[in-house]
Amino acid sequence: MEKFEGYSEKHKSRQQYFVYPLLFQEYIYAFAHDYGLNGSEPVEIVSCNNKKFSSLLVKRLIIRMYQQNFLDNSVNHPNQDRLLDYKNYFYSEFYSQILSEGFAIVVEIPFSLRELSCPKEKEIPKFQNLRSIHSIFPFLEDKFLHLDYLSHIEIPYPIHLEILVQLLQYRIQDVPSLHLLRFFLNYYSNWNSFITSMKSILFLQKENKRLVKFLYNSYVSEYEFFLLFLRKQSSCLPLASSGTFLERIHFSRKMEHFGIMYPGFSRKTLWFFMDPLMHYVRYQGKAILASKGSFFLKKKWKCYLINFWQYYFFFWTQPRRIHINQLANSCFDFMGYLSSVPKSPLLVRNQMLENSFLIDTRMKKFDTIVPATLLIGYLSKAQFCTGSGHPISKPIWTDLSDWDILDRFGRICRNLFHYHSGSSKKRTLYRLKYILRLSCARTLARKHKSTVRTFMQRLGSAFLEEFFTEEEQVFSLMFTKTTLFSFCGSHTERIWYLDIIRINDLVNPLN
């Protein structure tokens, strides 16, 4: 426990000061808008009237922030409509978004500078080579084939907004900045009395995407940082209850029994049994925890996670958000693929002199398929086909030029085909390609008031086929950095960060 407290204090001591004065620097907004910050997306603030970013409005906002009664009046008179008088609704809506986005931009700076200021001898190695998303699956095949159980985790989100502010207190020791963040969160949560905390979070996410992404990433970073520590120190933590103590004694007796029955059973093997190999993968607000061990051990880790969220982050999560499945008898959804590790029968014939033997064995194979029903549902929602997969025209695109229509359909088709080409079964991909190709032909025929047959005879089917098979490298993953964490002695943990460069809306259903 002393190690945990010391590690926690060391983690909390990395605080940043003097963040609030940066909000008054004009160049911060211009720099973030023109170039982005450390490779992130450029800031584009959109108001209710589709008015985009304006440096002049930022300058006016900074001048208003210098006025002492600007925020004071907003705090003392919360019933006023949206930070300002109800007559200036547009400016109040726009100013509130600029303030929140500017706060997120400024707070990101010290976190980015901390990564860039590491010593040369401890510099994080970077791999600038681009790799396809399909390189992930050989990695999973190499790691998951020897595991037994898989836990699907829906990462919970704090319902109370004050928890997010408390998490930032560990990193930022700037009281005015934290007060400003509280002001924004309370402003959105108290806008209407009937809005619950979860609805206020969704409303905040809709209007201030950058701020919500920063708060969510801070929460996930804090959760994973201590989760990794608990993983490394799970066998070293003190026993908290008598039941666990008796369980440890019973396990020690089993170890002695193994030592008597099997003298060659080394301590290293027993340590591997006590502390089995685990792999943790997080994506799209979900996580996968795969390990080699018993079902009872996975249930214990489930209880650990629930108690960890409850006692450290002060909110309760439902146990149903963590599903435990046997890896050999279930499939899991990972980045648009349905992956599984089935056991395939294999018949081997062995010839020894005049005798031959047939050996029936089973081998594990990492299989990835495309969820056809799900993707057809997304195409149907985007009005490319019916719910049963019958292609239809896209009337909203008939006002575009022929080249724009072909370009849009071709880009969607190439993106889907390139992203899901790692599937072991290509039949679904050809069906999606057929739907988009025929939907494009129907759209062009509708625009020219002709039939699909006449249109295809005039242009030729080879033109569409050549257009849809044009290669375009749009999806790639970058192995940007690996970090070595050292918690106890010489044990280290290698963590890979995968940055998705670009992804299509149809491929990513969360967008």
UniProtKB/Swiss-Prot annotation:
Compartments in which it is found: Plastid, Chloroplast
Any one biological process term the GO annotation gives: tRNA processing
A GO term from the CC aspect: chloroplast
Coiled coil: none
Entries under Pfam families matching the protein: Intron_maturas2, MatK_N
Keywords noted in UniProt: Chloroplast, mRNA processing, Plastid, RNA-binding, tRNA processing
GO molecular function terms attached to this record: RNA binding
Domain of life, per lineage: Eukaryota
Family membership noted in the UniProt record: Belongs to the intron maturase 2 family. MatK subfamily.
Described function: Usually encoded in the trnK tRNA gene intron. Probably assists in splicing its own and other chloroplast group II introns.
Protein name: Maturase K
Origin organism lineage: Eukaryota, Viridiplantae, Streptophyta, Embryophyta, Tracheophyta
Record gene name: matK
